[in-house]
UniProtKB/Swiss-Prot annotation:
ATP binds at S18, L19, G20, K21, G22, L23, D75. Belongs to the CTP synthase family. Keywords: ATP-binding, Glutamine amidotransferase, Ligase, Magnesium, Metal-binding, Nucleotide-binding, Pyrimidine biosynthesis. Pathway: Pyrimidine metabolism; CTP biosynthesis via de novo pathway; CTP from UDP: step 2/2. UTP binds at S17, K190, T191, K192, P193, T194, Q195, K226. The active site is at C382, H509, E511. It comes from Ehrlichia chaffeensis (strain ATCC CRL-10679 / Arkansas). The lineage of its organism: Bacteria, Pseudomonadati, Pseudomonadota, Alphaproteobacteria, Rickettsiales. CTP binds at S17, D150, I151, E152, K190, T191, K192, P193, T194, Q195, K226. This is CTP synthase. GO terms for molecular function: ATP binding; CTP synthase activity; glutaminase activity; identical protein binding; metal ion binding. The gene is pyrG.
Length: 532
């Protein structure tokens, strides 16, 4: 590592979780990038899972898939969308992965009879992850998951403390995000939680250089001075992380409160002002729209909308591109039946996202049937495409008991089946993952959307269309317009309906490649069709 040129920014959080550390880290990256610096962002997650791939979306939220096939925390999606820098498997690590690698090294004899301990062996592995391949970067922004004080976070905090000591203040800065709650009854902001959070962080040897406080309103000068005195942080480095209506307001908001300026001052770096015109343009468009598009999303994880974070953002990007306001009607697939189709009366389009398991399948099928019969724009993603095939096989091709072996292993017509190479005893890491090529049929709607014959999209699935049913379904009007290669045994990646204005299913996850500045063409077309 070129210690003279690479600076490390560590972002920690206190008081409560879900304050927006990932968005703060992404905003810092975007602001430094707007000044011309080369950056990367990394995430340390303290849970014992090797990755979030087998975790419930209701507990953890979305699993974000990188180009190289890593199943990662949803914050990596924020990193990519805010900066355009593609993340990799080297940008997210968990306690589980650290221990997994540690025990493999121990079994190989790499430690030569040493007593393997948290310090130095675990912390050394964490340090290696943070420092790996950073010598050509100006800044590495590293977010530490969880909350200061959690027992799971201790090895990670010790690791960044060590890096801060070894590289000195000239090359490291600690940014701590806390909560300053507003008590309605007292009509005042309370700083005590922030004081205790900084005290907790200081107890492990880390003195924050900047405090970001999450709040509805800014603190007064007197309140900032109080925190500065009690937390040993300059009052100019106590910066608000205010609630915003649109997350893409955050970089400009942080810049207006001098966050990037104070970071550069810490490192004694002179820099031109950031070019934030693209961020201003996005906000100007989103604030000026008057027309609304209504999209119905039918899913089973809607109790935690973070389960669909990239999907929501991709629809927002496409709506901004089409200069309309997005309104999402969330429908729980487990409570939807064929007698409630009036729920779709005021929607412009229907979307079925990815998912797992048979819970709520009938509700999704009801929505697909409605979209097909009423010529409403429909987009099915991953399982959404598979269910569209099952619905078509049953109701149009009249195949008896057409289903997926994921839902019924012994169905008569398994139009969706598990890929043979993925039939393993382990669930974790046992899917087709990451960016793969997809060959599009010339003259198809999907080709007209992408305007190219070969695309690359990210996948996350272990079930696929059974090619034995291809000819039969084609005879009834289902069109297969995208495949994984040009061979006869290629996986089906895209389907369309012959007699429908806009009905597309994709096996891949296009939402992972959308950004506010490069809205995904498939979502642009979907929103446009919703307006027609």
């Amino acid at each position: 590592m070129n210690q003279a040129s690479t600076r490390f920014i560590f972002v920690t959080g206190g008081v409560v979780s879900s304050l927006g550390k990932g968005l703060a880290a992404a905003s810092i990256g975007a602001l430094l990038q707007a000044r011309g610096f080369k950056i990367c962002l990394r995430k340390l997650d303290p849970y014992l899972n090797i990755d979030p791939g087998t975790m419930s979306p209701i507990q953890h939220g979305e699993v974000f898939v990188t180009d190289d096939g890593a199943e990662t925390d949803l914050d990596l999606g924020h990193y990519e969308r805010f900066t355009g820098v593609k993340t990799t498997k080297n940008d997210n690590i968990t306690t589980g992965k650290v221990y997994h690698n540690l025990l493999k090294k121990e079994r190989r004899g790499d430690y030569l009879g040493q007593t393997v301990q948290i310090i130095p062996h675990v912390t050394d592995l964490i340090n290696s992850f943070i420092l790996h391949d950073t010598d050509k970067l100006d800044f590495v922004i590293c977010e530490i998951g969880g909350t200061v004080g959690d027992i799971e976070s201790q090895p990670f905090l010790e690791s960044i403390r060590q890096i801060g000591y070894k590289l000195s203040k000239n090359n490291t800065i600690f940014v701590h995000l806390t909560l300053v709650p507003y008590i309605d009854a007292a009509m005042e902001l309370k700083t005590k939680p922030t004081q205790h959070s900084v005290k907790e962080l200081s107890s492990v040897g880390i003195q924050p250089d900047i405090i970001l406080y999450r709040s509805k309103i800014p603190l007064s000068k007197e309140q900032r001075d109080k925190i500065a005195n009690l937390c040993n942080v300059s009052s100019t480095n106590i910066i608000p992380a205010l609630d915003v209506k649109n997350i893409y307001e955050l970089p400009i908001s942080y810049h207006n409160y001098n966050l990037d300026t104070q970071i550069l001052n810490h490192f004694n770096i002179d820099s031109p002002e950031p070019d934030l015109r693209k961020w201003e343009n996005i906000l100007n468009i989103s604030h000026a729209v008057t027309k609304t598009v209504n999209v119905a999303i039918i899913g089973k994880y809607i109790k935690l909308l973070d389960a669909y974070k990239s999907l929501i953002e991709a629809l927002e990007h496409a709506s901004i591109h089409n200069k309309v306001k997005l309104s999402i009607k969330w429908i729980d697939s487990r409570s939807l039946d064929s007698n409630e189709i009036n729920i779709f009366d005021k929607v412009d389009s229907i979307l079925i996202p990815g998912g797992f398991g048979d819970d709520g399948i009938q509700g999704k099928m009801t929505a697909i049937t409605y979209a097909r019969l009423n010529k409403i724009p429909f987009l099915g993603i991953c399982m959404g495409m598979q269910l569209a095939i099952i619905e078509f096989a049953n109701n149009v091709a009249h195949l008896e008991d057409a289903n997926s072996t994921e839902f019924n292993l012994y169905c008569k017509n398994p139009v969706i089946h598990q890929l043979p190479e993925l039939q393993q005893n382990f669930l974790g890491g046992s899917m087709k993952l990451g960016s793969c090529p997809c060959y599009l049929e010339s003259g198809s709607k999907i080709f007209s959307i992408y305007q190219q014959s070969i695309i690359h999209e990210r996948r996350r699935h272990r079930y696929a269309f059974n090619l034995q049913y291809k000819d039969l379904l084609e005879q009834h009007g289902l069109i297969f317009t995208g495949k994984s290669n040009n061979n006869n045994d290629s996986l089906i990646e895209v389907i369309e309906l012959k007699d429908h204005p806009w009905f597309i299913g994709v096996q891949f996850h296009p939402e992972f490649k959308s950004s506010p500045f490069h809205s995904h063409p498939l979502f642009i077309s979907f929103i446009k069709a919703s307006l027609d």
